């Protein structure tokens, strides 16, 4: 029976230490949280600037709800597009120095809608092997040829581009890779896009608000500008709210508005969220002190960790992965940390390649130095004991 097979598949997940579970928070997003009835110090959140519970954002959300109501009532192309959505898109485009931006309800929807709108059968996509699942799914939905090149290897990408006779080419990459914390070689990728007449789509989910001048992201940090660039920024991470946007040349964004199915065939995001995001953008622009504090915490963690067998992967971003390897051991270490009041997620396949299970430490500007030292001391001790 189908249900028996499903139960067997679930049991197999347990056997391989791959079943995922949820934990329930009873407090707002912050490092010190009440989780499943316990007081915990959390290193899980991608609220990198500590804005999710910022009073200015909660006030903006309240004001927006009073003015605009709870929902928008329709899709953007029917009657669900409000003046505050226009204002947000204009502000986002200006912030990342692009001609125009389009606001999506989620980052997943932005990626899975944008890629199939740009390429299809007869076209080719060239994707870093460690791209986020939403980029992979968008590529598969497009039905274009999918070439996955070795992670961070522009030479492999160049060979694939040179061998392709596709009518349209799209290079797709994370800016900051979510499970490793490293940054893509964006300048080299843009040079290849120009040489081989390709689009370059950059998903800056973990760079927007954190990297670059004024938090304008990894593309701004690299000093890049081109009509070929299609920039995706996430608004539920450093921005502390929800949603995502795609920015670029005005004609590209117009095309996405006409063709991106995840934009067209869904009710628009509540205008109160757009109101909140306008307040978030102001805090991001003025957030140099937060970003400097975050850089200091990253440096402190890397100094304090003295691991011998486990590997702290090279990363200058708030994502600091500790590679353990074995699924069961990674889970056991995460449980041991949990027992000490430290919440650090164990990341396992299929999110990461087999044999690379890890702890994914996420630092935020809301952490303090003592928080980081406490975590480092616990990890050093646990590794020595195992």
Swiss-Prot record:
Task: Tell me the Pfam families matching this sequence.
Answer: Aminotran_1_2
Q: List keywords of the entry alphabetically.
A: Biotin biosynthesis, Pyridoxal phosphate, Transferase
Superkingdom of the organism of origin: Bacteria
Xref: InterPro entries = Aminotransferase_I/II_large, AON_synthase_class-II, AONS_Archaea/Proteobacteria, AONS_Proteobacteria, PyrdxlP-dep_Trfase, PyrdxlP-dep_Trfase_major, PyrdxlP-dep_Trfase_small
**What GO annotations for molecular function exist for this entry?**
8-amino-7-oxononanoate synthase activity; pyridoxal phosphate binding
> According to its UniProt record, in which pathway does this protein act?
Cofactor biosynthesis; biotin biosynthesis
The coiled-coil regions, if any, are none
Keyword Disulfide bond applies? no
Enzyme Commission number(s): 2.3.1.47
Which coenzymes or cofactors are required? pyridoxal 5'-phosphate
Q: Which residues get modified to N6-(pyridoxal phosphate)lysine?
A: 237
Instruction: Fetch the CDD domains from UniProt.
Output: KBL_like (cd06454)
The residues listed in the UniProt record as binding pyridoxal 5'-phosphate, with positions renumbered to this chain, are: 107-108, 178, 206, 234
Q: Where does substrate bind?
A: 20, 132, 351
Q: Which reaction does it catalyse?
A: 6-carboxyhexanoyl-[ACP] + L-alanine + H(+) = (8S)-8-amino-7-oxononanoate + holo-[ACP] + CO2
Biological process annotations from GO: biotin biosynthetic process
Looking up PANTHER family in the UniProt record yields: 8-AMINO-7-OXONONANOATE SYNTHASE, CLASS II AMINOTRANSFERASE/8-AMINO-7-OXONONANOATE SYNTHASE
Function, as annotated: Catalyzes the decarboxylative condensation of pimeloyl-[acyl-carrier protein] and L-alanine to produce 8-amino-7-oxononanoate (AON), [acyl-carrier protein], and carbon dioxide.
The entry describes its oligomerization and partners as:
Homodimer.
User: Which family does the record assign?
Assistant: Belongs to the class-II pyridoxal-phosphate-dependent aminotransferase family. BioF subfamily.
What is this protein identified as? 8-amino-7-oxononanoate synthase
Q: Which gene encodes it?
A: bioF
